UniProtKB/Swiss-Prot annotation:
Sequence repeats lie at residues 120-122, 123-125, 126-128, 129-131, 132-134, 135-137, 138-140, 141-143, 144-146, 147-149, 150-152, 153-155, 156-158, 159-161, 162-164, 372-376, 377-381, 382-386, 387-391, 392-396, 397-401, 402-406, 407-411, 412-416, 417-421, 422-426, 427-431, 432-436, 437-441. Residues 80-107 have a biased composition (Polar residues). It comes from Plasmodium falciparum (isolate FC27 / Papua New Guinea). Residues 56-194, 225-445, 520-678 are annotated as: Disordered. Residues 566-663 have a biased composition (Acidic residues). This is Glutamic acid-rich protein. Residues 56-79, 109-120, 231-329, 371-411, 532-565 have a biased composition (Basic and acidic residues). Keywords: Malaria, Repeat, Signal. Residues 372-416 are annotated as: 9 X 5 AA tandem repeats of [EGK]-E-H-K-[EKS]. The keyword Signal applies.
Length: 678
């Protein structure tokens, strides 16, 4: 591993050095090429400009000379008819023509004045035509120049694109490690460094040309036109040499890359195939191990689930049984309590009936009495309340004593009940006496007692007191003799007026009051009968409710049992399905194993058959040898020559046997390969 790591690091360092050298070399070559291209373009442009300017100057001079000569001729012919201005112009033109071409002057004094006008017209037409031709020629020249420049630009672009593609291909090969530089020897790095230094020193002038315009001008740039012609030839020669060298280098690089690419590709393909095979084997082994682990994990999970489910079911059953027991106990307790209450209710009802007394009515509003009488009434009410409070406490104490006696012994209960009944009768008499006292106080309000059904006139305050003590009051209209109005100052005080106004009642309603039917104490027999009927109805209702609850509970229990049975059946079915799936998987695995065993047996049988064939052949050969030996024994004395022939035959037979054995081994190997592929 250490050796591989070191070799890998060395390759990376070598690749980095090669890329740096190549980049510097490409940069220097690019500078030189750009310099040569600039020189070429400058020379071509300057040469074209010089040639065009010289030609145009020559043409302009010739055209001017011709026009001047013709004008002079025309002026000489038309001297008498022209004006002084024409004479001056002719004189100036003669001076110019004499200064340019004095040899081309022609005397025109021999021509006639009649033909002068026609000639002028012809000359004007010719001038016009010439001007048109010159304009067309100039346009054509410009178009040709533009076309040439466009072609030149396209060629430059095409060359640049080619170089970029080549450089990109080379760099891609460097990145993949498929390309090696030319001078990649033991001392390759030193040689490359020396070459780069020499190229940079030789091309220092080129860098100066690109960097500063003044130096380029001093070396024969665009300062003087004559120096351009001198340097143009040298630059062209250098360009040709550089192009030829570049072509050779490119061709060599392409050949080297092709050879290296083929070898490296083959090696990499082999390595990749080997790695793929190794990875496939590893993946197969990992997959097999994962499958085994998953199967084991699933089996363990199933076992754990089953155990947990069984435990949960047991716990649920235990909890249900506990709940049922608790509910039954609660029901029993409830029934016991209800029975005790029913036994105690008739005693309490009898006590309540005896305790039901007319409500202590306060002083009426319509009572026109002295304040002393009013105080006496209030004092009586207070005494009545205190008496009731004492009686209530006395009842509670007696009730506690009765419960205590019941717990001690049942026989004593009957005696205690008799005593209580006697005490209740005495109390009833005492209460009736108090009622009569209260009625006397109430009778003061009565105007005329015509209603004999126990109807009494009650004030609003009396009505409120009755409602506070839960005594029902029925309102009825008063009879006509009772509706006797009394004057307001005689009946009402200031306090009464304020109460009437607060309750939003009319004075007449307050004066008359309201009639209320107070519940008169019923007879004891009727009350007992009513209470007995009520208790029986309540008991029947409770029984009915209990029956319904029992039915509901039974139905719930039946449903729960049915659900449990269904769940058990579903679980059994699921277990059976899981077992079937496991059996199917095991059967499939067994079938696969059997198929593999059958294939192996077939291979073994083929091998055995081949071995048997070989053994039979050997036996046949042995029998033949024995026969030959017997014949030899019989004929030893007769023919010794036959012995030599038999020996030769034996050798041939042995050779044939060896060949057959080799063929049989080859067949066995082939069959094994085929089976392995299958």
């Amino acid at each position: 591993m250490n050796v591989l790591f070191l070799s890998y690091n060395i390759c990376i360092l070598f690749f980095v050095v090669c890329t740096l050298n190549f980049s510097t070399k490409c940069f220097s070559n690019g500078l030189l090429k750009n310099q040569n291209i600039l020189n070429k373009s400058f020379d071509s442009i300057t040469g074209r400009l010089l040639n065009e300017t010289e030609l145009e100057k020559n043409k302009d001079d010739n055209s001017k000379s011709e026009t001047l000569l013709k004008e002079e001729k025309d002026e000489k012919d038309d001297v008498p008819t022209t004006s002084n201005d024409n004479l001056k112009n002719a004189h100036n033109n003669n001076e110019i023509s004499s200064s340019t071409d004095p040899t081309n002057i022609i005397n025109v004094n021999d021509k006639d004045n009649e033909n002068s006008v026609d000639k002028k017209k012809d000359k004007k037409e010719k001038k016009h035509k010439k001007d048109k031709k010159e304009k067309k020629e100039k346009k054509d020249k410009k178009e040709k120049k533009d076309k040439k420049e466009k072609k030149h630009k396209k060629e430059k672009k095409h060359k640049k694109d080619k170089k970029k593609k080549e450089n990109s291909e080379v760099m891609s090969l460097y990145k993949t490690g498929q390309h090696k530089p030319k001078n990649a020897t033991e001392h390759g790095e030193e040689n490359l460094d020396e070459e780069m230094v020499s190229e940079i020193n030789n091309n220092a002038q080129g860098g100066l040309l690109l960097s500063s315009p003044y130096q380029y001008r001093e070396q024969g740039g665009c300062g003087i036109i004559s120096s351009v012609h001198e340097t143009s030839n040298d630059t062209k020669d250098n360009d040709k040499e550089n192009i030829s060298e570049d072509k050779k280098e490119d061709h060599q690089q392409e050949e080297m890359l092709k050879t290296l690419d083929k070898k490296e590709r083959k090696q990499k393909e082999k390595e990749m195939k080997e790695q793929e095979k190794i990875e496939k084997k590893k993946k197969k082994q990992e997959e097999k191990e994962k499958k085994k682990q998953e199967k084991e994990r699933k089996k363990q999970e199933k076992k754990e689930r089953k155990q947990k489910e069984k435990e949960m079911k047991k716990q649920k059953k235990i909890e249900k049984e506990r709940k049922k027991k608790e509910e039954k106990e609660k029901k029993k307790k409830k029934h016991d309590k209800e029975n005790e209450e029913t036994m105690q209710q008739p005693d309490q009802t009898s006590e309540e009936t005896n305790n039901e007394i007319m409500v202590p009515l306060p002083s009426p509003l319509t009572d026109v009495t002295t304040p002393e009488e009013h105080k006496e009434g209030e004092h009586k009410e207070e005494e009545h309340k205190e008496g009731e409070h004492k009686e209530g406490e006395h009842k509670e104490e007696e009730h506690k004593e009765e419960e205590h006696k019941k717990e001690e012994h049942k026989s004593k209960e009957h005696k205690s009940k008799g005593k209580k009944d006697k005490g209740k009768k005495d109390k009833g008499k005492h209460k009736k006496a108090k009622k009569e006292k209260v009625k006397k106080h109430v009778v003061k309000n009565v105007i005329e007692d015509e209603d004999k059904d126990g109807v009494e006139i009650i004030n609003l305050e009396d009505k409120e007191a009755c409602e506070e003590q839960h005594i029902t009051v029925e309102s009825r209209p008063l009879s006509q003799p009772q509706c006797k109005l009394i004057d307001e100052p005689e009946q009402l005080t200031l306090m009464d007026k304020s109460k009437v106004e607060e309750k939003n009642l009319s004075i007449q309603e307050q004066l008359i009051g309201t009639i209320g039917r107070v519940n008169v104490v019923p007879r004891r027999d009727n009350h007992k009968k009513k209470m007995a009927k009520i208790e029986e109805a309540e008991l029947q209702k409770q029984k009915h409710v209990d029956k319904e609850e029992d039915k509901k509970e039974e139905s719930k229990e039946v449903q729960e049992e049915s659900k449990e049975v269904q769940e058990d059946e579903e679980e059994v079915e699921e277990d059976e399905e899981e077992e079937e799936e496991e059996e199917e998987e095991e059967e499939e695995e067994e079938e696969e194993e059997e198929e593999e065993e059958e294939e192996e047996e077939e291979e073994e049988e083929d091998e055995d058959e081949e071995d048997e064939d070989d053994a039979e052949e050997d036996e046949d050969d042995a029998e033949e040898d024995e026969d030959d030996a017997e014949e030899d024994d019989d004929e030893e004395d007769d023919d010794e020559e036959d012995d030599d022939e038999d020996e030769d035959e034996d050798e041939e037979d042995e050779e044939e046997e060896e060949e057959e054995e080799e063929e049989s081994e080859k067949k066995i190997k082939r069959n094994l390969r085929k089976n392995a592929k299958i």
